[in-house]
């Protein structure tokens, strides 16, 4: 799972427009982040908000690597991107979990820009949404974006 540190979180609501800026860390070595698969590419409250997102990745040790997945349509095969130290990914559509290889730690700096509002409402892929109940700390992480 992951640990999150908000740099421009909800407490700065009146001073930063529609930006959310955070640092995310994998906890332990290897593992998934952004799981269960989620998206935020459509304004349809109360289920989801439209936020474009940019990630910049770092690994420890710096020769580590991971994979960014992007599934643009539910039920269809998506894209997989090999990410290394310094990789930048821009996401504007689709479910987008990522994973770091065993034996490595992953950090990523993330900037989310809300197109209509600042608070983020993530829509979790229905086939995997039940995982929210099984992952320690995930509900607290979700609440911090609102």
Predicted regions and their residues:
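Active-site region of the double-stranded beta-helix
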Residues: 1-85, 100-146
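Short, charged beta-turn/beta-strand-edge "cap" motif at the junction between a beta-strand
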Residues: 95-97
């Amino acid at each position: 799972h992951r640990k999150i540190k908000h740099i421009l979180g909800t407490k700065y609501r009146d001073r930063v427009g529609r930006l959310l800026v955070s640092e995310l860390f994998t906890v332990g070595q290897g593992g998934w982040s952004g799981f269960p698969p989620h998206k935020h590419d459509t304004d349809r409250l109360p289920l989801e908000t439209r936020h474009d997102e940019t990630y910049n990745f770092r690994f420890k040790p710096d020769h580590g690597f991971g994979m960014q997945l992007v599934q643009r349509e539910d039920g269809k095969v998506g894209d997989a991107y090999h990410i290394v130290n310094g990789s930048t990914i821009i996401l504007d559509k689709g479910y987008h979990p990522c994973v770091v290889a065993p034996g490595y730690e992953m950090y990523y700096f993330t900037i989310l820009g809300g197109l209509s509002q600042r608070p983020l409402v993530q829509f979790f892929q229905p086939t995997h949404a039940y995982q929210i109940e099984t992952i320690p700390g995930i509900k607290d992480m979700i609440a911090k974006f609102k």
